[in-house]
């Protein structure tokens, strides 16, 4: 279940970030203007100029066979770059958390097993100013579109123009940081940045901006949804489409980049089919029948008890457990603070005390989950259990009251209940906080300061979400809080999410050890009222803005870690999310005809590196 939440939010927006530890200085600080093959945000790059492949791939993997994967949801577009189809685009086209960039590509590709590091892809060389005021790319002369046309500097210039004019967040807003883009050679293009930019922004241009084909895109209709198979530079082309049901990709035998070091061991299936299902139950049944090749598991009860069918016993279905080295993703109930009922932080804090993790974990999840506490859970970036250091206190000094004392000194933790489902200790604390906020309790109802019964809606989009919402609803009702759970279809959910038309949702945030500009889209004041942004909670706090600025300005590891921890403390103290839980591992079941590399990178398993084994 957790994996489905994370996959949904990953699929609609994945900043080009990876995760690992950080070095002290930017790579090549003494000679950053020299063309090179890689860029690193902090620290040296791990692979030499003559590297042959990423260490988590099998360069000898066979190129054959097919992969059929199921996802929950629907789609009605093949345009992932505009607001209209932001959350209804078919999976796999670009920047997909599971499938990668099958059709569209970026100038450089991130490694999943080292610091925030990018390697050559469409651009064979990169040069960057030591102050990161400009970056210049030299395109690979072999780069071609799927129709055989060369990828040119004009395509890069066109991409900048079209995304600035008609692109969705974050593409359109990002481009305002570019002061000038110019052709500097037959295959070279330079981006010069203005005062809005920061040290991370060149990395985002390199690793997160798609390059689009000027000759194959109609500028007048680019803002529309479309089901026309696109022209891309990636390893796959769209073979067939059944809207809302299925999209099939075919490996391009003429893919220009198949021998690049950054592509060896990837893209091993001749055909990839993504099948859409209404719910996980039907998806799992299809997997059991062998219709699907893999099943990405997020339900601990199912993992523990329902893999008892014959194919498992016969060894034909294999259960794999993968360990990641990145922070746990954040899953939580999200308060929409644009709603007056959630404007008071004491109210949010009180409601956060009323989620009984111990009861839910034992009764719903076979005790497999761990409680999430931090937005960078389980990493050196987490503030939980650590008192603020001198640099953090310096950053936070201008914002008295932004961080609660227990969060500042590292003693804060979510409540641990007796697991009965009706522990009175957190309920009493919640009662006291609501009373301080002006609530009264009459006839079994919580009455807000305006004299109205305290009531709100939790919007969900699946039976699994509804199940955990029901558990929360039960605890809230004990304090007289009336909660209605409204499960809507995927299209309605996406529309309401995009326009912030909800009281509370279950929200998921992908975490990394290299947080950067995506934090503006999640928490920045400027994103609060931007439709399609990921500021689900409606955060608009000067302290948050200042901490984001600090982490982006950091030039060394110590300052970066302090800034992220300070941001973590402000977010925890703001009570914008009720943190729920996470799995300590990744679980994937596969039929034995599918194989994967032995090495798992820091970011976890990488589906684009798997292959088919049958003759």
From Swiss-Prot:
One of its GO terms (biological process) is peptide transport. Pfam families: SBP_bac_5. Belongs to the bacterial solute-binding protein 5 family. GO terms for cellular component: ATP-binding cassette (ABC) transporter complex; outer membrane-bounded periplasmic space. Coiled coil: none annotated. The keyword Calcium does not apply. Keywords: Periplasm, Signal, Transport. GO terms for molecular function: peptide transmembrane transporter activity. The keyword Membrane does not apply. InterPro entries: Peptide/Ni-bd, SBP_5, SBP_5_dom. It comes from the Bacteria. This is Putative binding protein BRA0576/BS1330_II0571. Residues 1-29 form the signal peptide. It is found in: Periplasm. It comes from Brucella suis biovar 1 (strain 1330).
């Amino acid at each position: 279940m957790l994996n489905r939440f994370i996959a949904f939010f990953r699929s609609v927006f994945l900043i080009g970030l990876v995760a690992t530890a950080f070095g002290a200085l930017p790579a090549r600080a003494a000679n950053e203007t020299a063309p090179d093959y890689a860029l690193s945000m902090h620290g040296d790059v791990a692979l030499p100029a003559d590297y042959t492949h990423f260490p988590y791939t099998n360069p000898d993997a066979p190129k054959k066979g097919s992969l059929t994967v199921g996802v929950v949801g629907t789609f009605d577009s093949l345009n992932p770059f505009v607001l209209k189809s932001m959350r209804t685009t078919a999976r796999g086209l670009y920047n997909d958390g599971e499938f990668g960039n099958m059709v569209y590509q970026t100038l450089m590709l991130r490694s999943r097993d080292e610091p925030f590091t990018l390697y050559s892809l469409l651009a064979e060389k990169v040069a960057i100013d030591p102050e990161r005021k400009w970056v210049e790319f030299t395109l690979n002369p072999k780069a071609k579109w799927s129709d055989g046309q060369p990828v040119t500097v004009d395509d890069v210039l066109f991409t900048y123009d079209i995304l600035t004019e008609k692109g969705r967040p974050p593409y359109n807003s990002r481009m305002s940081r570019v002061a000038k883009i110019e052709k500097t050679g037959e295959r070279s293009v330079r981006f010069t940045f203005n005062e809005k930019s920061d040290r991370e922004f060149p990395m985002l241009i390199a690793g997160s901006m798609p390059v689009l084909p000027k000759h194959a895109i109609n500028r007048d209709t680019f803002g529309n949804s479309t089901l026309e198979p696109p022209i891309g530079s990636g390893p796959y082309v769209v073979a067939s489409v059944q809207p809302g049901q299925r999209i099939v990709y075919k490996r391009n035998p003429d893919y220009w980049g198949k021998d690049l070091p950054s592509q060896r061991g990837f893209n091993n299936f001749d055909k990839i089919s993504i099948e859409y299902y209404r719910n996980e139950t039907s998806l799992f049944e299809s997997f059991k029948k062998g219709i699907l090749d893999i099943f990405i598991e997020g339900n601990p009860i199912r993992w523990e008890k329902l893999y008892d069918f014959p194919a498992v016993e016969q060894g034909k279905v294999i259960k794999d457990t993968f360990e990641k080295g990145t922070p746990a993703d954040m899953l939580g109930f999200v308060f929409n603070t644009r709603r007056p009922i959630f404007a008071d932080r004491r109210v949010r804090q009180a409601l956060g005390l009323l989620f009984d993790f111990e009861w839910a974990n034992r009764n719903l999840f076979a005790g497999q989950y761990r409680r999430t506490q931090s937005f960078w859970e389980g990493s050196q970036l987490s503030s939980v259990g650590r008192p603020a250091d001198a640099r953090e206190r310096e950053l936070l000094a201008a914002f008295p009251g932004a961080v609660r004392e227990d969060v500042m000194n590292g003693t804060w933790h979510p409540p641990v209940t007796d697991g009965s489902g009706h522990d009175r200790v957190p309920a009493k604390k919640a009662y006291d906080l609501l009373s301080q906020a002006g609530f009264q309790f009459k006839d079994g109802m919580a009455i807000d300061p305006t004299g109205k019964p305290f009531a709100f809606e939790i919007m969900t989009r699946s039976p699994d979400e509804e199940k955990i919402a029901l558990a929360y609803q039960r605890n809230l009702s004990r304090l007289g809080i009336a909660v209605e759970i409204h499960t809507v279809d995927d299209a309605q959910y996406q529309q309401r999410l995009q326009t912030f038309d909800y009281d509370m949702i279950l929200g998921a945030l992908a975490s990394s050890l290299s947080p950067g500009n995506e934090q503006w889209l999640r928490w920045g004041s400027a994103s609060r009222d931007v439709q399609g942004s990921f500021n689900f909670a409606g955060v608009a706090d000067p302290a948050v803005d200042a901490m984001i600025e600090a982490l982006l300005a950091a030039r060394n590891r110590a300052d970066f870690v302090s800034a992220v921890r300070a941001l973590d403390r402000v977010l925890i103290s703001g009570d914008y999310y009720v943190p729920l839980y996470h799995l300590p591992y990744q679980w994937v079941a596969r039929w034995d005809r599918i194989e994967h590399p032995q090495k798992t990178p820091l970011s976890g398993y990488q589906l684009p590196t798997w292959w088919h084994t049958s003759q």
